Amino acid sequence: MNISNINNDIYLGGLGNHSTEEIKNFLIDNNIKCIITIWNFNKLNIKKLNINVKDYMYIHAYDLTNEIIIDYFDITNKFIINKIKEGKKVLIHCYAGISRSASIVINYFMNKYNINYDEAEKIVSKKRNIKPNIFFILQLKFYNSYKNINIIYLIILFAIRYTLK
């Protein structure tokens, strides 16, 4: 299977050339109960994979340099965090497991560890060959900067409010 274990809870891969039976066997063998699909094909047949509808997220996205994926960063992070809290492993996949799904996993690690793109990319690339397209990289860097700007803004507001008391 074209899937890599990134850490105890996160698997990253490409399912483009695998049958439903191969996928099902891999999920069973690795005790994976949750899936995020991010590609421009049909949803996976989760009934045949024995995946609960609440444990499946589908995002229709192309691997193109004009595709907007930043809108999905918050919801995928929440999904992954919640499923891990439930004690479930999560597979994040696209067609090849190199760009779209890798971007989702990089974003997860950026948020989990409060690190920048380069640090998160290193964590993921140690376990799997990845190459997010340049526009996905720009979105990841922007998202991380924007998130940090909001934190700085809140700290300044708190400091001003505290000073005025």
UniProtKB/Swiss-Prot annotation:
UniProt xrefs under PANTHER family: DUAL SPECIFICITY PROTEIN PHOSPHATASE, DUAL SPECIFICITY PROTEIN PHOSPHATASE MPK3
SUPFAM superfamilies in alphabetical order: (Phosphotyrosine protein) phosphatases II
GO process annotations (BP): negative regulation of MAPK cascade
Name under which the protein is recorded: Putative tyrosine-protein phosphatase AMV078
Record-listed E.C. numbers: 3.1.3.48
Species whose genome carries this gene: Amsacta moorei entomopoxvirus
Alphabetized Pfam families for the sequence: DSPc
Location of the active site: 94 (phosphocysteine intermediate)
